[in-house]
Amino acid sequence: MEIIRGAPALSTFRVQKLMEACVSAALPVRQIYAEYVHLADLSELLKPTEREQLEKILTYGPAIEAHTPQGSLLFVTPRPGTISPWSSKATDIAHNCGLGKVKRLERGIAYYVESDTLTAEQQRTLQGLLHDRMVEVVLNDFAKADVLFKRTEPAPFKSVNVLAEGRRALEVANVEMGLALAEDEIDYLVENFVRLNRNPNDIELMMFAQANSEHCRHKIFNADWTIDGKAQPKSLFKMIKNTFEVTPDHVLSAYKDNAAVMEGSVAGRFFPDPNGVYSYHTEPMHVLMKVETHNHPTAISPYPGAATGSGGEIRDEGATGRGSKPKAGLTGFSVSNLKIPGFVQPWEGNYGKPDRIVSALDIMTEGPLGGAAFNNEFGRPALLGYFRTYEQEVSSHNGVEMRGYHKPIMLAGGLGNIREEHVQKGEITVGAKLIVLGGPAMNIGLGGGAASSMASGQSSEDLDFASVQRENPEMERRCQEVIDRCWQLGDKNPIQFIHDVGAGGLSNAFPELVNDGDRGGIFNLRNVPSDEPGMSPLEIWCNESQERYVLSVAAEDLPLFTAICERERAPFAVVGEAIQEQHLTLADSHFDNNPIDLPLEVLLGKAPKMSRNVVSAKAVSPALEQSQIDVKDAVKRVLSLPTVADKTFLITIGDRTVTGLVNRDQMVGPWQVPVADCAVTAASFDTYAGEAMSLGERTPLALLDFGASARMAVAESIMNIAGADIGSFKRIKLSANWMSAAGHPGEDAGLYEAVKAVGEELCPELSLTIPVGKDSMSMKTAWQQDGVNKTVTSPMSLVITAFGVVQDIRNTVTPELRSDKGETSLLLVDLGAGQNRLGGSCLAQVYGELGDVAPDLDDAALLRGFFETMQKLVANKLVIAYHDRSDGGLFTTLVEMAFAGNIGLDIDVEDLQGTDLERLFNEELGAVLQVSRDNAAKIAAQFAIAGVPCHVIGTLADDQCITIKDGAREIFSDTRVALRTVWSETTYRMQAMRDNPACALEEFKLKQDETDLGLTVNLSFDPSEDVAAPYILKGAAPKMAILREQGVNSHVEMAAAFDRAGFESRDVHMSDILSGRISLEEFQGLVACGGFSYGDVLGAGEGWAKSILFNERARNEFSRFFERDSSFALGVCNGCQMLSNLKEIIPGSEHWPRFVRNRSERFEARFSLVEVQQSPSLFFQGMAGSRMPIAVSHGEGHAEFASAQALALAEASGTIALRFVNGKGEIATQYPQNPNGSPNGLTGICTTDGRVTLMMPHPERVFRTVANSWHPDNWGEDSPWMRMFRNARVNLG
C-alpha cells in the first residue's frame, strides 16, 4: 500500500464551523487541521515515472496552503470491506491514464487535533463530528488503513430449524433479523416449509420479508376493512382504482409498472441515430410520472436518505415499460420544528427526540443537499417542491397529544418521456439472459423495505443504520445512457423487460422480474458483481446497493447489449436465465449448494390477506382565540414560518436548467423570487407543447377533518397547475402519496375517509384519474426519555402531484406582477365563498393553536368552474399574473406577488367578510389575478357565470409600500423591502449555517437593496437575424464532435444548439477515442459538454483532462486537433474545467486559470447576468457589450490564477470573453450576482487566436427563448445565445 499525501481538505470557514461544533459539544479542542490522504493498492511497485504520474493525477482542487501537521491523528476512511464511489471512479481514471499496476485507489481525511486530554466519551463525541459511522471508520494510524485492501473469505448461509423447533425458531429469527413478519405470515411460512419438508435458509426468509413487507406489498391498501362494526365494500386500493374506471381517458399504463404513463403530445424527439448523428424523430412523446417517499432513511441519515430517495425514483422512471427517459424532478419535505439556533420561534417548543434519529434542523440542512446532489449529478432538473414544518400539541380524539414529523416525509418524484412502442413490457423468452446492470453489491441498506414498514422505535438502532443505502449518481447516469441507447433503437430495443433494484435488493427485483414475465429463473449467486467478498449469500442477494437495474435480454441480443454497456462503461453481469417453470433457484458455486430453491408461489403467492377492524373518531378543538392577536405580529410570525417563508436555500442548490427543456422553474421574474406555482417543460426543442407538474398538500387539516385535508390537497394541486395552458381536467393525472400512523387510534378510519373522499367522490366528479401513488403507513416515532414514554405522531398526510400535458408553454402565467402593462386590477377569486375558516391554518400554528373548523372544497363544481374559466383566460392571454391562495392566506399570496414584481400594492378588502385576521389569513381555496383594468369586470363576470365568487381587491401602488385597507380604515402598511426581509430571514439563517456565511449575508443584503435592478438586457445585435442562414443553404453540414465522458449530462441540448446552427452534431464518447473507434480528424469542431465527469472525484474536469494527458492515443488525438489552424473548440462548465487543464496542448492558452470550488462552497444553480467582452473568440464576434442572463449550474466555477500577476496578464491579453455583471452593467463582485466569486467577474476566456473558448455558464440550455427563466416579451423563438452557435458556423464559411 502506497500512502500519498494530498491537499488540505477544509477551507478556513469549514474549519471554523467544525471548531464551533466542538465548542457547542464542550470539547477542549484548540485547533484542527485536515488534509486528504490517498491510499494506493498496487499489484507491483511503481517506477519513478509512474509514481510521478500518479502524484500528478492525485493533485487537484483549489490551492489552499498546507500546514505541517500537529496534534493527534484521527484518520477517517471508508468502512473496511466497502469500495467508495470515489474509489471506483478514481481507479477508473488511473486505468484510463495507463496505470494498470494500480489495483485500487482510496481516499481518507487525516484530522490533526490539538486539544487537552480527552475522556473516552469526549473522543466518541469528537469522532461523531468527524465521520459518518454508516460508511466510515476512524483509525489512529495510517498503516492500519491497509485493512481497506484485505479480502475476506465468503460466509455461508444459515438455516432456521423449523422442522425440529417449529414456530418458535421463526419467531426468534423474526426479531433478530428485523423481518417485520406478521403472525399470520409466520404461520404461512411454517406451513409451507413443513410441506416442502425442509428448513428455510436465512436468505429465503429475508427475501420473503422484503417481498411481502408493507413497503412492497401495500397490505393496508389491499386489506378488507370494517369500520365501527360495519364491513366496508371496497379496499383503499379499489377506491383509488375507481378513478381510472370512471376516467380512463389518456392513460396508457396504470398500477402495474414502475411508473404510470399518459398520452403526451407529438414532437420531434432529438437523439443520435445508431451512426451517432443527432436528428429529430417526429413521434408521440408520452409522459410517465412517478412520486416516491423515502422517509425512514432520511430520518436516520438525511443526506444519503434523500439522495437515494431521488435516485430510486429516477430508476423507477427509467425502468418503465421497456426503458424510458427521466426528464424533470421534484422534492418535498415535511419535518418537525427547525429551532434554528439564535432564531427559535415563539411557537417552537422543546419536546425532545430519540437519539437514533436526527433533528428536523439536521434533516433540512443535509437532506435537501442529498436530493439535489443526486439530481444534479444525474442530470435531471429539480423544478418543484414543498417544505412544511409542523410539530404541535393538539387536542385530538385521543386527548392532548404531540403531532408532528419526527419521522419526516421525504418526497421524490418527477416526469419523463417514453416511446409508444415501449410503454408495455415485452415478453421474457425462455432462455433469455437475466442481467443486473449497474454498480456492485455492497453490505448496505439491508432490510430497508422491512425497516421502513415499522414505526420508528420498533427496530434496533443498528438495524436502523443498516437499512440506509448510499448513493453514486454518476453510476446511475451511465446506466441511464445504456437504457437510452436501447430505447433509441426502437423496435430493435434489446431490453425485453426491466425493473429497478430498490427495497429488498436483488431478492425482490429478480423474483419480481421473472414473476411479472410469467417465468421462473435459475441464478448464480457468484455472478453478482460484489465489492465485499466476505458477504454471506443473504448479504449479496438482499443488500440494497443502489444504481442497479435488472432486465432480460434475448440471448441473440446479448452481443449488442454488451457493446452498448462497454461503450458507456456501465458494469453489468449475466446472473441468470429465464425458465418456463415458475420456480426460483439460486446456486452458489463457491459452496456448491443452493441457498434458494423455492416455488415462486411460496415467495409471492397467497400470503394471508390483512383485515382491519377499526373505530372512527372525531376531534373537537376550540376556535382560534383572535382577540389578543395583533395584525403586525401575525404578519411577522406567518412570514417567518418555514412553510410560508422564502425557500431559496432549498432551490439554488439544485440544477434547474439541464436538458435545455425547462420552461418554468421555481424562480420567477427579473429578481428570481421562488414563488412559482408549477413547473413546466417543453416536449422537445422543436415544439411549444410540453408538460407541467404541481403539488398539493394541506396535512395539518387532517387533525380536524380527514376528508377535508384530502380534498384540499387535490384542489391545491389543481389551483397550482391552473396557470399552465392545459385545457381540460382529463389531460391532468394525479399521483397520490399517502402517509399515516396505521394503528394509532382513529387514524385508520380517517385514512379510509380520506381515500374515499378522493377516490370515490371528488376525482370521479372532476374527471381526474389517480394512476400512480405510494403509501407509507408507519408515520409515528416512539421513545423513552428519562423514564417517560414519548410519541410524536404525524397527521394523516396526503401529498398530491398533478401532471398535465401543456398545449402551449408560452402561455404559462406566473405570480410576477407587471407594472409595464398599463392600468391593471387585482382580482380575488374566492372558492371558499367568504367562509374564512381558520382551522389548521399557518396563523393558528404560529400561535400554538389548531382552530376548530378546517377549510374545505364544499362543492366540486366550484373547482370545475374555476379551472375551466381560468384555462380559457390563460389560452387567450388575458391574465398578466396569477398566484393561488394557500399557506399563509391572502396576505402571503399578495406579498409574494409583490416580491416577484418588485412593486408595492394598494389593497382594499372592504368587500370581503370576516375579521381582519380572517380576511388576511384564512387558507380557503382561492387565487389572485392581475388583469388589465379594462377587462376586470368582464373577467369577474366570467367567474360569476361559472359560480365562483370574484372581487376586485386593489391595484399596484405608485411606491414600494404594501398597504391594506378596509374602506377608509388602514389595517396594515409596511414597505415591500421590510416584508421581504422578514420573509427571507429563515433562508438566510439556514444558508449561513450550512454554507459560507459571508456569501449568505451578501445575498440577504441584496434582497434588501431597493436599487437592485434585477436582470436587465442590453444587446448590441439583433437576435432574430440568422447570420448562419447563407452558409446553411450551401448544403453540406460541417461535422461537430459533441464530446462526453462518463458522467457528462448536458450533451443533448448542446447537440441541439449546434444542429440548429447548421452543424452535423455527432455523439462522441471518450471511450470511442481511447479505443480508436473515432478520430478527431473527422471533425471541424469539438465541444466538451457539461456535467460531472467521473463524478468530479479528482477535481471538476481534472480527471477527464488527465485521462487525455496521460493516455498516449488520446493525447495525440487532442494535440493534433488543437494544432490544426482550421479547428475550433468550445468548453462549457465541466468541459470548460476539463479544457482549462489541457493548457499544455492548446496553443495560445497560457493565461488561462483553473476552475475550482465556488466561494460559497456550494453547488450554485442561478440565472445570472453576464456581459460579453471584446475578445478574439470566434463564438462572440459581433456580440461585445451585450448584457443578458444565462443559466449557471456548477460547484467549481471559481477562476483561480496562480498569482495576482497571472490575473493581470490574462486581463491584459484581451482574451477574457465573458464577465458576471449586475443590472447596472457593473462588474459583479458580490454574491450571488457573482455566483462563484471569480476575480473581476470572469466566467469566460479564449485562446489568443479565438479558436478555443471556455465558459462556465450554459448557453446551450437557453438557446430557445422559452428555456429562459425570465426574458423580455419581445424575444422571438431564438434567444440571443443562439448567435454564439451561428457565429461558429459563419467562421467556417
Curated annotation (Swiss-Prot):
Q: Which residues bind ATP?
A: 305-316, 676, 886
Q: Does the keyword Nucleotide-binding apply?
A: yes
Query: One GO BP annotation here?
Result: 'de novo' IMP biosynthetic process
Q: What is this protein called?
A: Phosphoribosylformylglycinamidine synthase
Q: What organism is this sequence from?
A: Shewanella oneidensis (strain ATCC 700550 / JCM 31522 / CIP 106686 / LMG 19005 / NCIMB 14063 / MR-1)
As its record notes, the protein acts as a catalyst of: N(2)-formyl-N(1)-(5-phospho-beta-D-ribosyl)glycinamide + L-glutamine + ATP + H2O = 2-formamido-N(1)-(5-O-phospho-beta-D-ribosyl)acetamidine + L-glutamate + ADP + phosphate + H(+)
The alphabetized UniProt keywords are:
ATP-binding, Cytoplasm, Glutamine amidotransferase, Ligase, Magnesium, Metal-binding, Nucleotide-binding, Purine biosynthesis
Q: Which gene encodes it?
A: purL
Q: Which GO terms describe its cellular component?
A: cytoplasm
Q: Where does the Glutamine amidotransferase type-1 domain lie?
A: 1040-1293
Q: What does this protein do?
A: Phosphoribosylformylglycinamidine synthase involved in the purines biosynthetic pathway. Catalyzes the ATP-dependent conversion of formylglycinamide ribonucleotide (FGAR) and glutamine to yield formylglycinamidine ribonucleotide (FGAM) and glutamate.
Q: Where is this region: Disordered?
A: 305-327
According to the UniProt entry, what is the EC number of this protein? 6.3.5.3
MF-aspect GO terms: ATP binding; metal ion binding; phosphoribosylformylglycinamidine synthase activity
The biological pathway it contributes to is: Purine metabolism; IMP biosynthesis via de novo pathway; 5-amino-1-(5-phospho-D-ribosyl)imidazole from N(2)-formyl-N(1)-(5-phospho-D-ribosyl)glycinamide: step 1/2
What PROSITE patterns does UniProt report for this protein, alphabetically? Answer: GATASE_TYPE_1
* Enzyme class name: ligase
